[in-house]
Swiss-Prot record:
[2Fe-2S] cluster binds at residues 3, 6, 18, 25. Its cofactor is [2Fe-2S] cluster; hybrid [4Fe-2O-2S] cluster. InterPro entries: HCP/CODH (IPR004137), Hydroxylam_reduct (IPR010048), Prismane-like_a/b-sand (IPR016099), Prismane-like_sf (IPR011254), Prismane_a-bundle (IPR016100). GO terms for biological process: response to hydrogen peroxide. Pfam families: Prismane. The modification Cysteine persulfide is found at residue 408. It catalyses: A + NH4(+) + H2O = hydroxylamine + AH2 + H(+). It comes from Tolumonas auensis (strain DSM 9187 / NBRC 110442 / TA 4). This is Hydroxylamine reductase. One of its GO terms (molecular function) is metal ion binding. Belongs to the HCP family.
Length: 553
């Protein structure tokens, strides 16, 4: 086992990355090694997807499969070895399907097909022991002594960024948004990484290409969400329990939330969101369901305590899941899509009757707690509508600075930095936030500036797209570049979606980003120095020092 993809990975002066019997996330060495094999085989599928496209063959089902399977290897998504082996078997079937169709098309065209090499030529059995025996050949650090730590770090930056993009592509596909050009670009990048590149500049270019591609993906996802559910509107959300039977929906998948709401109508069940599902309350399509009563709990790292205390059924629609046996709720949590945990019931299709039956059999909340509200829904449309008023307040000198403080949350004590930073932001500044990092401070009162709330919850992690659109609109209004705006980005990262959002921002030329609570373990001192010199990317220090530097710039 070797895994260094998330922020909680082992990091000491002598050891970088999880490499023992279990990762810090709870992933076993067995699952980690199987995921390495899966990624290697997926690069072979992409190789043949590129070849097939050269003869006019595009298979959207296989395009979707590759993203789904790669998504399953993100942090806190799938811990089930049997499910990973099923993905491995499907990878070889899909590759062989593309191969046979590609070779047949070449034969018809009277040209010789390109020979398969590397991942595209690998044939493995379905036997777990044999897969694990072969796994060292697919380890992400398999030849680091020959290539050096800098090249390995760049390969991993690209791979982990591509994982994040794959997740967003799958979220978009579920909502009917699948773009063949983006799919082609994705396969080309996967194929490139499968060649085990050893040159620094092509890998840097690849990282920027992933960022640019993900900007298109975020636009697709934004389109899918807004065309399906309407544009989010500023909305007040109750954060306290409501009496009655209950289902909790966590993850990111709005499609699943809609199906659950439809199937629970009239059944006396209240539906609560959790974590990154909080922004769902702002979509017009969900406001017609009175039994969507509020949000329960906070960020992913608190689920073992919060889910254990929740007296109903829980549905995990995407990341992040952690060991449900700790809180003894494995018998009432259900996984969806690419999510998996051994022994937990997995739901295929859109029938949530099993979840509903479980919720009805449980006690539910005995009484209403005193409501406590937070605001969400300041996504692209709402921000664009507010932009003229914001611009007027900037010109009047009432708004002097914008802060984007958000990203992934986690359980490290150092993440208290983000709470203190939000508290310390001057009263003449607006704070935009997104993703589960908002839970570090969204229960605080920030007031407003002449009717404009000082805290603006943009939405889920992918709604960084909305924040980017606001920045572009402000830059246009003030006839300057984004980097010339009084805008500071203070981001918290944890997993691969955050990595691809960072690459997206860097590929758009955004500079001066602060990242914490620590820097990614796969980035070497040389790579960090390059990112600092090229993009002014820097780690957080202290609230006092960072705020002083930001406001003095």
């Amino acid at each position: 086992m070797f895994c260094i993809q998330c922020e909680q990975t082992i990091s000491t002066p002598t050891t970088k990355g999880c490499s023992y019997t279990m990762g810090m996330c709870g992933k076993t060495a067995e699952v980690s090694d199987l995921q390495d094999v899966l990624i290697y085989l997926l690069q072979g599928v992409s190789d043949y997807a590129v070849k097939a496209r050269s003869v006019g063959i595009v298979d959207q089902a296989i395009d979707a499969y590759v993203c789904q399977a790669l998504f399953s290897t993100l942090t806190n998504v799938n811990f089930d070895a049997a499910r990973i082996i099923a993905f491995i078997n499907e990878a070889q079937q899909n590759r062989d399907s593309l191969k046979s169709r590609y070779e047949a098309a070449c034969l018809l065209a009277g040209k010789a097909p390109e020979a398969a090499t590397g991942p595209a030529a690998l044939i493995l059995t379905a036997d777990k022991a044999e897969l694990l025996a072969w796994a060292p050949n697919a380890a992400v650090n398999r030849n680091y002594k020959e290539i050096g730590e800098d090249i390995l770090g760049l390969r991993l930056l690209c791979l982990y960024g591509l994982k994040g993009a794959a997740a967003y592509m799958e979220h978009a596909r579920v909502l009917g948004q699948q773009d063949d050009e983006v799919g082609a670009e994705f396969h080309q990048i996967m194929m490139f990484l499968g060649t085990e590149p050893t040159e620094m500049q092509p890998l840097i270019d690849c990282a920027m290409q992933i960022g640019q591609m993900n900007f298109k993906v975020m636009a697709l996802l934004d389109k899918g969400e807004t065309e399906t559910f309407g544009h989010p509107e500023p909305t007040r959300v109750n954060m306290k329990p409501v009496a009655g039977k209950a289902i909790l929906v966590s993850g990111h998948d709005l499609h699943d939330l809609e199906k659950i709401l439809q199937q629970t109508e009239g059944k006396g069940i209240n539906v609560f969101t959790n974590g990154e599902m909080l922004p769902a309350h702002a979509y017009p399509a969900f406001k017609k369901y009175p039994h969507l009563v509020g949000n329960y709990g906070s960020a992913w790292q608190n689920q073992q305590k919060e889910f254990a205390a929740f007296p109903g059924a829980v549905v995990m629609t995407s990341n992040c899941i952690i060991n449900p046996n700790v809180g003894k709720y494995a018998d009432r949590i259900y996984t969806r899509s690419i999510v998996g945990w051994p022994g937990v019931t997995h739901i295929e299709g859109d029938d949530f009757s099993t979840v509903i039956e479980k919720a009805l059999s449980l006690d539910g909340f005995p009484y209403d707690e005193i409501p406590h509200y937070t605001m969400t829904g300041f996504a692209r449309n709402a921000l664009m509508a507010a932009a003229p008023a914001v611009i007027d307040q900037v010109k009047a000198g009432n708004i002097k600075h914008f802060f984007l403080i958000g990203g992934c949350d986690g359980d490290k004590q150092e993440r208290g930095y983000y709470t203190e930073m939000a508290k310390a932001v001057p009263q003449d500044s607006l704070i935009l936030t997104l993703a589960c990092g908002k839970f570090k401070f969204n229960d605080l009162e920030f007031g407003d500036i002449n009717g404009i709330p000082r805290l603006l919850d943009v939405g889920q992690c992918n709604d960084a797209y909305s924040a980017i659109q606001l920045a572009l609109a402000l830059a246009e209004a003030f006839e300057c570049g984004v980097n010339d705006l009084p805008l500071s980005l203070v981001l918290s990262w944890f997993e691969q979606k955050a990595i691809v959002i960072l690459l997206t921002l860097l590929s758009l030329g955004v500079k001066g980003i602060r990242v914490g609570p620590s820097v990614p373990g796969f980035l070497t001192p040389n790579l960090l120095n390059f990112l600092n010199e090229t993009f002014d990317l820097r780690p957080i220090t202290t609230v006092e020092q960072d705020l002083k530097d930001i406001l003095a710039a």
